[in-house]
Regions:
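N-terminal alpha-helical interaction modules that lie
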Residues: 1-73, 132-194
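TPR repeat positional signature
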Residues: 34-39, 86, 90, 127
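Extended ligand-binding groove/face enriched in aromatic
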Residues: 52, 64-88, 93
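Short coil loop/turn residues that delineate tetratricopeptide repeat
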Residues: 65, 119-120
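Structural signature of alpha-solenoid helical repeat junctions
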Residues: 78-85, 102-105, 122
Length: 194
């Protein structure tokens, strides 16, 4: 969308009414895909921050409720259908914690995700993030200096940082002890749920 199209969408009362109805209905229906579609539209259009935050909180609430059900069934999250959106919500919440310099909170959430996600590439990427979080590197510095912004990845990874400007496999090997120590410190988070 160009600036003119964004302005038209932002000022079109019918579209805004539709978007608000969709927001309300997606929350009532507990439809995480529709909730995210609405949230993404609201963010692009830079609409009411309070409604955006309310919708985001509903997404987190729904994701955590459903992830708990999945854990209680001893299942794992696959990066497809609504599971992809649950993973996105947990991940975005972890990144939000990191951006607020809550390194331990972000690390805990990413650790739980590593043990919950059924996807090797994402698990490795999350482990890389855990190692950087252990050094308390700020998110902006990490993003500017360690993320490969040019490399395209599979669409299902579009919500996650999986491309780095270094050999992540080698990095994981070189930092194996740090990761093992973090796992030891965080294992209580998953043992309690088993």
């Amino acid at each position: 969308m160009d600036k003119e199209e964004l302005f038209q969408a932002r000022t079109n009362p019918d579209f805004l009414k539709y978007l608000n109805e969709t927001r309300v209905n997606s929350i009532k229906a507990k439809d995480i895909a529709l909730m995210y579609e609405t949230l993404d539209s609201m963010l692009v259009l830079d609409l009411d921050e309070e409604q955006i935050n309310e919708l985001y909180q509903e997404i987190l609430k729904l994701a955590f409720e459903n992830v708990e059900k999945i854990i209680n069934k001893n299942k794992k999250l696959k990066l497809e259908d609504e599971h992809l959106f649950y993973a996105r919500a947990l991940y975005e919440h972890a990144i939000e914690k990191w951006s607020n310099e809550n390194f331990d909170g972000a690390k805990e959430l990413l650790f739980v995700m590593v043990n919950l996600i059924e996807d090797e590439l994402l698990q490795k990427a999350l482990n890389v993030l855990i190692i950087f979080l252990s050094s308390k590197m700020e998110l902006d510095e990490f993003y500017d200096s360690k993320v490969d912004l040019e490399k395209a990845s599979d669409e299902k990874y579009g919500y996650f940082i999986v491309n780095f400007n270094f050999d992540s496999q080698k990095y994981l090997k070189e930092n194996k002890r740090i990761l093992e120590q973090e796992y030891e410190n965080l294992k209580h988070l998953i043992v309690e749920h088993k």
